[in-house]
Amino acid sequence: MSTQRLRNEDYHDYSSTDVSPEESPSEGLNNLSSPGSYQRFGQSNSTTWFQTLIHLLKGNIGTGLLGLPLAVKNAGIVMGPISLLIIGIVAVHCMGILVKCAHHFCRRLNKSFVDYGDTVMYGLESSPCSWLRNHAHWGRRVVDFFLIVTQLGFCCVYFVFLADNFKQVIEAANGTTNNCHNNETVILTPTMDSRLYMLSFLPFLVLLVFIRNLRALSIFSLLANITMLVSLVMIYQFIVQRIPDPSHLPLVAPWKTYPLFFGTAIFSFEGIGMVLPLENKMKDPRKFPLILYLGMVIVTILYISLGCLGYLQFGANIQGSITLNLPNCWLYQSVKLLYSIGIFFTYALQFYVPAEIIIPFFVSRAPEHCELVVDLFVRTVLVCLTCILAILIPRLDLVISLVGSVSSSALALIIPPLLEVTTFYSEGMSPLTIFKDALISILGFVGFVVGTYEALYELIQPSNAPIFINSTCAFI
C-alpha cells in the first residue's frame, strides 16, 4: 500500500457495528454531484431495499445482543424492557437526525456523500458561534476518536467473549451430556485462567488482521453471519422452553445497577455510524427512512425479546453473555463454539475502521521501502493493545458497559442532537426542537458520566471479582 494512496484515500465511516467494509460507499468525499435534488444519491450504486435491510439487521446483531439479559437484570423485569424501548426510539431518532443533516450538506455543498465526521465538521462550520466555526475541524477528530475507542472497545469485548466461551467449553468437555433439555450439574475440569486463553487467541487474531483485502474480509463476514444466525436461532429455541415462575424477579432493580444497564443497552444500539454508508449504496435512497425504521423496529423487538426471555429463563444466574448459561450438552456447546467462530472472524471487520484512521498517519511518515513493515507493525500493536486491555478488564459485562458508556453514548446520543442545533439554528428552529435536542444530549451525557463511573467502580471492588464458572452449575 503506497504512501500516496494512504494520503489520498478518503476515509469512509463504515460503522461501529458488525458490518463489513465492502458494504461501505465506494465513492470518495470529493466526488461532486450534479446540481439539484438529493436524488443524485445512489445512482451509481446497486443495493436493493431488501439488501440494505439485511445489512442494517446484520450490523446491529453482535456481542451486545447476548449481554442484554444481564442488562435487563440490572434494570428490572419491567423497567428493563421499557428502558430498552425508550433508548431504541431515541437512538433511531438520532440516526434520523444524522441522515437529515447529511442530506442538508450534500445539497448545500454539492457533494455526493458525506460521512459522520464530515457532517459534524460542516455542522460546526454552520454554527452561529465563531469559536465553533474556527475549530470546526475538531468535529471530525472528535468523531474519529470515539469511533476508534468504540471499535477497539468492541475488539476488547471479543477477546473476553472468546476466552470465556472457549474456557467453559473446554472445562465442561468431560461432562458434556446428550440431555439438551435441562441444565445439569457437571464436574468442571479446571484449566488455565481466562486471560491465558486471551493470549492464546492473540497470534491468530494478529494474522487475521494482516488480511487487508476487502474482498477477502467479506468472505469472513459471510461465514460469521451464518454461524451467528444459526447460534441465535438455537439460543431462542432453548430460552422459550419451560420458563420458570417470574414472580421472584424484581420489577425494578436497585438504582445503583441501572447505569450498567444503560451502558450495555447503548452499546447494543450504537449502529449510527453505518446509516450513511448504507444509504449511499441504495438504488433508491428515498426509501431509506422506511428501511431504517423497519429495520430498527425488528432490532428493537429482537433486543427486548432476548433480553427479557433470557432473564426470565436464567434469573439471577444470568451471565455477561447468555451463551455462558446454555446447557453442557453437545448441541449447545456447539452453539457456543459457532458463535465464537463468528465473533473471531468479525474481529477483523471491527478492526478495519480504527486501522484505516490510525495506520495512514504512521505509514505516510515512513520510508517507502518500509511502508508494509510499518503497516503490519501498527496492526500488531493495536491487536496487542486490545488484548492487554481485555486482560486488565476480564469481565465481559463490565467491558461492554464501559465501552457503551464512554464512546457509544457520545456517537449515538450526545453528538447528533447538538449537530442538529449547529446545522439549522441559523435557519430558524422552534424552541421545542431545541429543548428536545438539549434534553437528549443531557441524558446522553448523564449516562456517559454515571455509566462510566459505575462500571469503573465495579471494576475496582475486590468483593465483586467474578468467578468464572458455568452458570448451569447453579441448577442442582
UniProtKB/Swiss-Prot annotation:
It catalyses: glycine(in) + H(+)(in) = glycine(out) + H(+)(out); L-alanine(in) + H(+)(in) = L-alanine(out) + H(+)(out); D-alanine(in) + H(+)(in) = D-alanine(out) + H(+)(out); L-proline(out) + H(+)(out) = L-proline(in) + H(+)(in). Residues 1-15 have a biased composition (Basic and acidic residues). GO terms for molecular function: ABC-type taurine transporter transporter activity; alanine transmembrane transporter activity; amino acid transmembrane transporter activity; amino acid:proton symporter activity; glycine transmembrane transporter activity; L-alanine transmembrane transporter activity; L-proline transmembrane transporter activity; proline:proton symporter activity. Optimum pH is 5.0-5.5. It is found in: Cell membrane; Apical cell membrane; Lysosome membrane. InterPro entries: AA_transpt_TM. It is a multi-pass membrane protein. The keyword Membrane applies. Changing C473 to A/S: No effect on amino acid:proton symporter activity. No effect on localization to the plasma membrane. Residues 1-51, 100-141, 212-215, 279-289, 364-372, 419-439 are cytoplasmic. Keywords: Amino-acid transport, Cell membrane, Disulfide bond, Glycoprotein, Lysosome, Membrane, Symport, Transmembrane, Transmembrane helix, Transport. It comes from the Eukaryota. Its main location: membrane. The chain crosses the membrane at residues 52-72, 79-99, 142-162, 191-211, 216-236, 258-278, 290-310, 343-363, 373-393, 398-418, 440-460. Glycans are attached at N174, N183, N470. Changing C329 to A/S: Loss amino acid:proton symporter activity. No effect on localization to the plasma membrane. This is Proton-coupled amino acid transporter 1. It comes from Homo sapiens. The lineage of its organism: Eukaryota, Metazoa, Chordata, Craniata, Vertebrata.
